[in-house]
A protein has these predicted regions:
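Residue-level detector of solvent-exposed, low-hydrophobicity positions
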Residues: 9, 14-15, 36, 59, ...
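Generic hydrophobic, helix-prone segments enriched in Leu/Val/Ile
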Residues: 8, 64-68, 111
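Alpha-helical oligomerization segments
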Residues: 73-128
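Aromatic- and glycine-enriched beta-alpha-beta binding-site module
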Residues: 1-35
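Conserved binding-pocket/active-site segment within a compact domain
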Residues: 22-94
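Short linear sequence motifs
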Residues: 1-3, 45, 100, 104-105
Length: 128
């Protein structure tokens, strides 16, 4: 939980207005990171995908934290929100081998899912 809170604080820096909350329920890590891929670019060819893979395959908590900090800085720069309650749960379950693979699978599925038209409209409306 501590890591999720510190990452939220990092993400929230510079966002002081009430509508600028970078915590968005229902936005998983994979989905948020996917929004960093430039429109029209294949996610598989993206530098974001390489960073995402490094995060998803990290085995040690310290390594996961390091990769997450870098990813959160990218999300902050692009003003892409993330669901921090889900991230806290994910970080908890990553500690256990039986559930870690499920967390990584969901992250990957969310990253590679084709965004719906509603997601694209919301993204254009909210993020530029």
């Amino acid at each position: 939980i501590y890591l999720a809170l510190t990452l939220y604080a990092l993400h929230q820096q510079g966002h002081t207005l009430p509508g600028d909350d970078m915590n968005r329920q229902g936005v998983g890590l994979g989905q948020a990171v996917r929004r960093l891929v430039p429109q029209g670019e294949d996610p598989a060819d993206s530098s974001i995908q390489r960073r995402f893979n490094a995060l998803a395959t990290a085995a040690q908590t310290r390594e996961i934290a390091q990769h997450l900090r870098g990813m959160i800085q990218l999300l902050r720069a692009a003003e892409v929100p993330l669901g921090y309650a889900q991230l806290a749960k994910d970080l908890f379950y990553l500690q256990f081998p039986d559930s870690a693979s499920q967390v990584r699978l969901r992250w990957g599925q969310d990253f590679y899912a084709i965004p719906s038209e509603n997601d694209q409209i919301e993204e254009e409306t909210n993020y530029g």
